């Protein structure tokens, strides 16, 4: 019997793998996170370590402290004791103890992040802890698969956002389908990381409940998600299981957008998705929807979806994209602004929105194979995403402004510095799941093409033509541009190695006219195999090496990494007369604490600045200490006295990577530095 069970399990896994291969959809395949091990004590190794040691334990502890787990326990109790006397008491009035109707997702997202971490740091205790959490999650699931504690705890008095009946206010506030999306994503990650289907079965039961009850057929609730993410999660579930019903439901949720009861720009429901050409509304919802459209387009071949997301992508990177890779100009509605509406001091740039852009840019690359999408993804990763989490993994930004006066309370909960948690904890828990997933963005494969998209110390085992290639990458990126790729094992023989040459090296900051380099620096790079220059070609931003590879072959890559200055399109009013400073993939900023003898808002950059790069140790609050490459430049401090007379004195400005600011408390910060008198202090 045991032998038969093992055989059936092997057959199931084989069929699942075949289904995944058959239905992936994208012309280019992402190398999964399970195949890439990030090297410890490297730039990204440190971040994954911080996620493991600090962020994820913190998130789990917050789930314990803030009633998240207890919500599942209470829902389970009600299921086991229908109509119990407690339901009539204030202690069981959901709105009095549950902050938001989507609080369940913090549990799911943290499990997802922990699952990714297990790939780099196997941990039996963590595995067992996750299993214990899944016990209480599963106990809260209703017999038909519905899992939404905001209602199940007390069906007669649910959370005030939940509505009286299932799906009744899904398009407004309930977040029932948003909860489903994060549950499915987490369950897929958990299955891929552990091989256990415990969470996957819970998620499938809820997805099956949704398929039964939400749709266009008679008797179904014809609604679409108020907050998108279920679309790409269901597509992921289809790819994992091969079950067509999940893809069909994902497509329904997209096809009926703009056709149901609610139609507004805020939730991108003002018109059908195929008619949308610009990025509008709540930036996180939008980004998740666009990523879901890409998934469904890849899996179904829907040309309408492809045309729409191509147009939306172009609108974002041409008119609504911050130099830091963030999106969402407005605090009101956490939303995209109008074309070229990119304020600095009051910019929103939610951390979750930056993460959603990584999802979109990755998918655009998998569809089209052009390095420009990875250029955008890299910019967002190194600036707009990691800025949202302190280097030690324990404090967070909800928004990410490009300037701060130390007074304007830009951060969530009306604060001006990084916080250990938020009442609405979507950003910390999202970082929990995203940072450890970074290995899955490193490489991609198409037929016999192996794409090297990102640069970070790692060892990867990659399938090419069904054969293993083990590739080791050694680098100090992003601090310098030297990368060594070593073939540690090759069963695939000849294949094409495609190495991305970043746009910041020899082209432009972004693939549009929104930003341009304003200096006359000529970027240069070299790529050699075993110390020898090789004949090659450039294709879509990739350096292509066609070769019969042997074990021990070393590809040496060098990207010059000079300091560059950037100007914005004149249509961006807030950046007129200003320049931004970059080095490699990192955007820099000036922070008051490094420049205490003058007001950085009144520092005037010279027309032809001369930069120096030096090592700097940042000694942050709460024993957070880390090293960066700082940039110094000579300029003028412009002062106006009581009589209105202007004077200028020479000063030396220090700049640090944007992600590193606010580790030493609140204060002045500026990304876009004035280069003309008219731009000084215009906040």
Where are these regions (language model features)?
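C-terminal beta-rich recognition modules with glycine/proline-rich loops and embedded aromatic residues
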Residues: 309, 375-383, 388-486, 506-529, ...
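Aromatic (Trp/Tyr) and acidic
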Residues: 21-124, 128, 158-193, 228-245, ...
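Aromatic-lined substrate-binding rim segments of carbohydrate-active enzymes
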Residues: 125-141
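Helix-capping and short linker residues that terminate individual alpha-solenoid repeat units
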Residues: 122, 138-142, 195, 211-215, ...
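Bacterial Sec-dependent N-terminal signal peptides
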Residues: 1-21
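Flexible glycine/proline-rich, aromatic-decorated loop/lid segments
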Residues: 264-266, 320-339
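Short, charged, amphipathic alpha-helices and their helix-cap/turn boundaries
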Residues: 156-162, 197-212, 268
């Amino acid at each position: 019997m045991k032998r038969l069970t093992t055989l059936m399990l092997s057959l199931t896994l084989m069929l699942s793998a075949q289904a995944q291969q058959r239905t992936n959809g994208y012309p280019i395949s992402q190398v999964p996170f399970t195949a890439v091990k990030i090297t410890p004590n490297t730039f990204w190794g440190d971040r994954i370590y911080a996620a493991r040691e600090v962020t994820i334990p913190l998130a789990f502890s917050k789930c314990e402290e803030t009633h998240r787990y207890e919500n599942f326990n209470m829902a389970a109790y009600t299921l086991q004791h229908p109509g119990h006397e407690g339901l009539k008491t204030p202690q069981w009035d959901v709105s009095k103890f549950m902050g938001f109707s989507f609080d369940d997702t913090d549990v799911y997202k943290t499990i997802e992040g922990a699952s990714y971490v297990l790939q780099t740091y196997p941990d039996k205790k963590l595995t067992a802890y996750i299993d214990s959490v899944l016990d209480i999650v599963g106990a809260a699931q209703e017999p038909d698969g519905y899992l939404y504690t905001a209602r199940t705890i007390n069906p007669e008095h649910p959370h005030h956002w939940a509505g009286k009946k299932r799906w009744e206010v899904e398009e407004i506030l309930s977040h029932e389908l948003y909860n489903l999306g994060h549950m499915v994503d987490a369950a897929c990650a958990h299955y891929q990381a552990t091989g256990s289907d415990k969470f996957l079965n819970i998620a499938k039961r809820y997805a099956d409940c949704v398929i039964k009850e939400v749709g266009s057929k008679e008797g179904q609730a014809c609604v679409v998600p108020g907050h998108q993410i279920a679309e790409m999660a269901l597509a992921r579930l289809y790819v994992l299981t091969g079950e067509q019903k999940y893809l069909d439901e994902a497509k329904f949720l997209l096809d009926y957008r703009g056709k149901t009861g609610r139609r507004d720009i805020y939730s991108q429901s003002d018109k059908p998705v195929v008619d949308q050409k610009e990025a509008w509304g709540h930036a996180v919802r939008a980004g998740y929807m666009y990523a879901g459209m890409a998934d469904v387009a890849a899996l179904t071949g829907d040309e309408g979806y492809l045309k729409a997301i191509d147009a939306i992508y172009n609108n974002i990177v041409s008119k609504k994209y911050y130099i830091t890779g963030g999106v969402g100009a407005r605090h009101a509605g956490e939303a995209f602004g109008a074309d070229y509406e990119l304020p600095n001091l009051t910019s929103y740039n939610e951390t979750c929105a930056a993460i959603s852009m990584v999802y979109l840019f990755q998918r655009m690359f998998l569809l089209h194979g052009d390095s420009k999408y990875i250029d955008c993804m890299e910019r967002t990763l190194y600036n707009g995403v990691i800025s949202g989490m302190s280097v030690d993994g324990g404090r967070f930004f909800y928004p990410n402004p490009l300037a701060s006066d130390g007074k304007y309370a830009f951060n969530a909960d009306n604060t001006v510095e990084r916080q250990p948690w938020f009442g609405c904890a979507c950003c910390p828990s999202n970082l929990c799941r995203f940072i450890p997933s970074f290995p899955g963005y490193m490489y991609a494969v198409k037929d016999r093409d192996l794409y090297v998209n990102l640069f970070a110390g790692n060892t990867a085992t990659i399938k090419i033509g069904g054969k293993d290639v083990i590739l080791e990458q050694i680098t100090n990126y992003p601090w310098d541009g030297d990368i060594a790729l070593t073939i540690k094992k090759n069963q695939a023989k000849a294949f094409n190695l495609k190495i991305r040459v970043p746009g910041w090296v020899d082209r432009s900051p972004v693939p549009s006219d929104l930003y341009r380099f304003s200096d006359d620096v000529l970027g240069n790079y070299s790529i050699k195999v075993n110390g020898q220059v090789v004949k090659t070609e450039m294709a879509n931003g990739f350096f292509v090496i066609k070769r019969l590879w042997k074990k021990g072959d070393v590809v040496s890559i060098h990207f010059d990494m000079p300091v560059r200055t950037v100007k914005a399109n004149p249509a961006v009013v807030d950046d007129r007369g200003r320049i931004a400073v970059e080095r490699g993939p990192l955007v820099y900023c000036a922070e008051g604490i490094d420049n205490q003898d003058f007001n950085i808002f009144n520092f005037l950059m010279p027309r032809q600045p001369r930069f120096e790069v030096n090592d700097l140790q940042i000694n942050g609050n709460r024993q957070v200490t880390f090293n960066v490459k700082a940039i110094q430049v000579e300029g003028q401090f412009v002062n106006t006295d009581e009589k209105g007379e202007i004077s200028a004195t020479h000063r030396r400005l220090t700049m640090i990577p944007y992600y590193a600011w606010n580790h030493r408390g609140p204060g002045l910060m500026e990304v876009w530095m004035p280069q003309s008198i008219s731009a000084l202090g215009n906040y």
